[in-house]
Amino acid sequence: GSDLLDFSATISNDSVTPYSGIKVDLEQTGTQRVHDYYGDMTILGIENIQGSNLNDYIKGNGQNNTLWGGAGDDVLDGVSANNILVGGIGSDTFRGGAGDNIIYGESYSTLGEAGTETDTTSRDLIDFSGAGNSIILNLSNFTSINYKDETTLSLEAQTSIGYGKNKIYNVEDALGGSGADTLIGSNIANVIDGGANNDIIFGFGGVGNTLIGGTGNDTIMGLLGGDKIYGGTFDGTT
Protein backbone atom coordinates (compact mmCIF):
# COMPACT_ATOMS: atom_id res chain seq x y z
CA GLY A 1 0.00 0.00 0.00
CA SER A 2 0.83 3.67 0.09
CA ASP A 3 1.53 5.00 3.58
CA LEU A 4 1.43 8.60 4.80
CA LEU A 5 3.35 10.21 7.65
CA ASP A 6 1.55 13.42 8.65
CA PHE A 7 3.31 16.25 10.53
CA SER A 8 0.71 18.91 9.77
CA ALA A 9 -1.19 19.06 13.07
CA THR A 10 1.53 19.00 15.72
CA ILE A 11 4.20 21.68 15.18
CA SER A 12 3.22 25.32 15.68
CA ASN A 13 5.14 28.54 16.13
CA ASP A 14 4.35 28.40 19.85
CA SER A 15 5.72 24.91 20.41
CA VAL A 16 9.24 25.05 18.95
CA THR A 17 12.30 27.27 18.98
CA PRO A 18 13.65 28.23 16.52
CA TYR A 19 10.64 28.44 14.20
CA SER A 20 11.88 25.86 11.71
CA GLY A 21 10.01 23.02 10.08
CA ILE A 22 10.70 19.33 9.71
CA LYS A 23 13.57 17.74 7.82
CA VAL A 24 12.69 14.31 6.42
CA ASP A 25 14.80 12.15 4.11
CA LEU A 26 12.94 8.99 3.08
CA GLU A 27 16.14 7.54 1.60
CA GLN A 28 17.65 7.50 5.09
CA THR A 29 17.16 4.04 6.61
CA GLY A 30 18.82 4.85 9.92
CA THR A 31 17.95 7.30 12.65
CA GLN A 32 17.42 10.90 11.57
CA ARG A 33 16.69 14.12 13.42
CA VAL A 34 13.34 15.16 11.97
CA HIS A 35 12.74 18.02 14.41
CA ASP A 36 13.52 18.89 18.01
CA TYR A 37 9.80 18.51 18.71
CA TYR A 38 9.92 14.83 17.68
CA GLY A 39 13.51 13.97 18.48
CA ASP A 40 15.24 11.17 16.57
CA MET A 41 13.10 8.98 14.32
CA THR A 42 13.57 5.94 12.11
CA ILE A 43 11.23 6.13 9.10
CA LEU A 44 10.76 2.91 7.13
CA GLY A 45 8.11 1.79 4.65
CA ILE A 46 6.68 5.29 4.14
CA GLU A 47 6.02 6.70 0.68
CA ASN A 48 4.15 9.95 1.39
CA ILE A 49 4.84 12.90 3.69
CA GLN A 50 2.59 15.74 4.83
CA GLY A 51 4.77 18.60 6.07
CA SER A 52 4.18 21.07 8.87
CA ASN A 53 3.00 24.68 8.63
CA LEU A 54 6.62 25.89 8.90
CA ASN A 55 9.61 25.80 6.53
CA ASP A 56 10.14 22.10 5.76
CA TYR A 57 12.69 20.06 3.81
CA ILE A 58 11.21 16.81 2.49
CA LYS A 59 13.10 14.34 0.30
CA GLY A 60 11.59 11.28 -1.35
CA ASN A 61 13.02 7.79 -1.85
CA GLY A 62 12.16 6.81 -5.42
CA GLN A 63 8.93 5.00 -4.47
CA ASN A 64 6.39 7.16 -6.33
CA ASN A 65 6.17 9.64 -3.47
CA THR A 66 3.54 12.27 -2.78
CA LEU A 67 5.12 15.10 -0.78
CA TRP A 68 3.00 17.94 0.62
CA GLY A 69 4.89 20.94 1.97
CA GLY A 70 1.90 22.59 3.64
CA ALA A 71 2.24 26.21 4.68
CA GLY A 72 5.69 27.79 4.93
CA ASP A 73 8.60 28.08 2.50
CA ASP A 74 9.36 24.43 1.76
CA VAL A 75 11.91 22.47 -0.27
CA LEU A 76 10.51 19.30 -1.88
CA ASP A 77 12.98 16.90 -3.52
CA GLY A 78 11.40 14.11 -5.56
CA VAL A 79 14.65 12.16 -6.16
CA SER A 80 13.31 9.71 -8.79
CA ALA A 81 10.23 7.70 -9.87
CA ASN A 82 6.83 9.28 -10.57
CA ASN A 83 6.21 11.86 -7.88
CA ILE A 84 3.54 14.37 -6.92
CA LEU A 85 5.02 17.42 -5.19
CA VAL A 86 2.61 19.95 -3.65
CA GLY A 87 4.07 23.15 -2.23
CA GLY A 88 1.03 24.66 -0.53
CA ILE A 89 0.91 28.26 0.66
CA GLY A 90 4.38 29.82 0.74
CA SER A 91 7.40 30.32 -1.51
CA ASP A 92 8.49 26.77 -2.25
CA THR A 93 11.37 25.16 -4.15
CA PHE A 94 10.87 21.96 -6.16
CA ARG A 95 13.47 19.48 -7.37
CA GLY A 96 12.00 16.75 -9.51
CA GLY A 97 13.67 13.41 -10.02
CA ALA A 98 14.05 10.93 -12.86
CA GLY A 99 10.48 10.07 -13.78
CA ASP A 100 7.08 11.50 -14.67
CA ASN A 101 6.45 14.20 -12.08
CA ILE A 102 3.47 16.42 -11.32
CA ILE A 103 4.35 19.56 -9.35
CA TYR A 104 1.85 22.02 -7.88
CA GLY A 105 2.99 25.38 -6.57
CA GLU A 106 -0.09 25.83 -4.41
CA SER A 107 -2.80 23.21 -3.85
CA TYR A 108 -3.86 19.94 -5.41
CA SER A 109 -6.95 17.78 -5.74
CA THR A 110 -6.57 14.01 -5.62
CA LEU A 111 -9.40 13.80 -8.17
CA GLY A 112 -7.53 15.54 -10.95
CA GLU A 113 -4.46 17.38 -12.17
CA ALA A 114 -5.73 20.96 -11.97
CA GLY A 115 -3.97 23.05 -9.35
CA THR A 116 -5.83 25.83 -7.54
CA GLU A 117 -4.14 29.19 -6.95
CA THR A 118 -4.94 30.23 -3.38
CA ASP A 119 -1.95 32.41 -2.45
CA THR A 120 -1.06 35.30 -4.76
CA THR A 121 1.72 36.76 -2.61
CA SER A 122 4.17 33.85 -2.53
CA ARG A 123 6.48 32.74 -5.33
CA ASP A 124 7.51 29.20 -6.17
CA LEU A 125 10.73 28.10 -7.86
CA ILE A 126 11.53 25.07 -10.00
CA ASP A 127 15.23 24.36 -9.51
CA PHE A 128 17.33 22.75 -12.26
CA SER A 129 20.64 23.96 -10.86
CA GLY A 130 21.94 20.40 -10.44
CA ALA A 131 21.00 19.32 -13.96
CA GLY A 132 23.88 18.94 -16.39
CA ASN A 133 21.93 18.47 -19.62
CA SER A 134 20.08 21.12 -21.59
CA ILE A 135 16.52 22.01 -20.56
CA ILE A 136 13.65 23.27 -22.70
CA LEU A 137 11.15 24.93 -20.37
CA ASN A 138 8.01 26.84 -21.34
CA LEU A 139 5.92 28.72 -18.78
CA SER A 140 3.77 30.44 -21.39
CA ASN A 141 0.60 28.38 -20.81
CA PHE A 142 -0.88 30.71 -18.17
CA THR A 143 0.93 30.08 -14.85
CA SER A 144 1.94 26.51 -15.56
CA ILE A 145 5.24 25.13 -16.76
CA ASN A 146 5.21 22.84 -19.77
CA TYR A 147 8.20 20.71 -20.67
CA LYS A 148 8.99 19.78 -24.21
CA ASP A 149 10.09 16.26 -23.45
CA GLU A 150 13.29 16.21 -25.48
CA THR A 151 16.26 13.94 -24.83
CA THR A 152 18.00 16.90 -23.25
CA LEU A 153 15.47 17.29 -20.44
CA SER A 154 16.85 16.48 -17.00
CA LEU A 155 15.03 16.94 -13.71
CA GLU A 156 17.54 15.09 -11.56
CA ALA A 157 19.23 17.44 -9.09
CA GLN A 158 22.16 15.17 -8.33
CA THR A 159 24.32 13.09 -10.70
CA SER A 160 21.77 10.86 -12.44
CA ILE A 161 19.85 12.07 -15.49
CA GLY A 162 16.11 11.53 -15.83
CA TYR A 163 13.88 12.05 -18.86
CA GLY A 164 10.25 12.24 -17.77
CA LYS A 165 6.96 13.65 -18.95
CA ASN A 166 6.46 16.35 -16.36
CA LYS A 167 3.58 18.70 -15.56
CA ILE A 168 3.99 21.72 -13.30
CA TYR A 169 1.28 24.14 -12.15
CA ASN A 170 1.35 27.52 -10.39
CA VAL A 171 5.12 28.02 -10.36
CA GLU A 172 6.38 31.50 -11.15
CA ASP A 173 10.19 31.29 -11.20
CA ALA A 174 12.81 29.04 -12.80
CA LEU A 175 16.52 28.40 -12.27
CA GLY A 176 18.39 26.71 -15.11
CA GLY A 177 21.19 24.19 -14.87
CA SER A 178 24.68 23.94 -16.33
CA GLY A 179 23.45 23.00 -19.82
CA ALA A 180 22.43 25.29 -22.68
CA ASP A 181 18.83 25.92 -21.60
CA THR A 182 15.81 27.47 -23.28
CA LEU A 183 13.57 29.14 -20.68
CA ILE A 184 10.32 30.88 -21.65
CA GLY A 185 8.23 32.92 -19.22
CA SER A 186 4.46 33.04 -18.73
CA ASN A 187 1.94 35.88 -18.83
CA ILE A 188 2.82 36.95 -15.29
CA ALA A 189 6.02 38.54 -14.00
CA ASN A 190 8.62 35.77 -13.78
CA VAL A 191 12.10 35.57 -12.33
CA ILE A 192 14.17 33.39 -14.68
CA ASP A 193 17.86 32.65 -14.15
CA GLY A 194 19.63 30.73 -16.89
CA GLY A 195 22.52 29.57 -14.73
CA ALA A 196 25.67 28.44 -16.51
CA ASN A 197 26.23 27.88 -20.25
CA ASN A 198 24.75 29.57 -23.34
CA ASP A 199 21.05 30.01 -22.59
CA ILE A 200 18.04 31.47 -24.39
CA ILE A 201 15.66 33.35 -22.06
CA PHE A 202 12.39 34.84 -23.30
CA GLY A 203 10.18 36.96 -21.02
CA PHE A 204 7.01 36.23 -23.04
CA GLY A 205 3.82 38.00 -21.83
CA GLY A 206 4.61 39.10 -18.30
CA VAL A 207 5.29 42.76 -17.47
CA GLY A 208 8.19 43.42 -15.12
CA ASN A 209 10.12 40.17 -15.50
CA THR A 210 13.56 39.69 -14.01
CA LEU A 211 15.68 37.84 -16.58
CA ILE A 212 19.20 36.76 -15.60
CA GLY A 213 21.62 35.22 -18.05
CA GLY A 214 24.20 33.92 -15.61
CA THR A 215 27.54 32.80 -16.97
CA GLY A 216 27.85 32.06 -20.68
CA ASN A 217 26.99 33.65 -24.02
CA ASP A 218 23.25 34.17 -23.48
CA THR A 219 20.38 35.53 -25.54
CA ILE A 220 17.77 37.37 -23.44
CA MET A 221 14.54 38.83 -24.82
CA GLY A 222 11.77 40.77 -23.08
CA LEU A 223 8.40 41.47 -24.67
CA LEU A 224 5.90 43.83 -23.02
CA GLY A 225 8.35 46.11 -21.26
CA GLY A 226 9.30 46.87 -17.69
CA ASP A 227 11.73 43.94 -17.57
CA LYS A 228 14.97 43.89 -15.63
CA ILE A 229 17.66 42.14 -17.68
CA TYR A 230 20.99 41.07 -16.24
CA GLY A 231 23.48 39.67 -18.72
CA GLY A 232 25.96 38.20 -16.27
CA THR A 233 29.57 37.34 -17.10
CA PHE A 234 30.66 37.00 -20.75
CA ASP A 235 27.12 37.25 -22.08
CA GLY A 236 26.33 38.01 -25.68
CA THR A 237 22.93 39.36 -26.70
CA THR A 238 20.61 40.98 -24.13
Q: Language-model features: where?
A:
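Short loop/turn motifs at secondary-structure junctions
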Residues: 1, 42-45, 54, 122, ...
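GD-rich hexapeptide-repeat beta-solenoids
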Residues: 2-38, 95, 99-162, 208, ...
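Short beta-strand elements of solenoid repeat domains
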Residues: 4-6, 48-50, 57-59, 66-71, ...
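Short, well-ordered coil/turn elements that cap or connect secondary structure elements
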Residues: 18-19, 43, 80, 131-132, ...
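Extracellular acidic loop/turn motifs
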Residues: 39, 52-56, 120, 164, ...
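Signature of short aromatic-glycine-proline-rich micro-motifs recurring in repeat-based ectodomains
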Residues: 42-48, 162-173
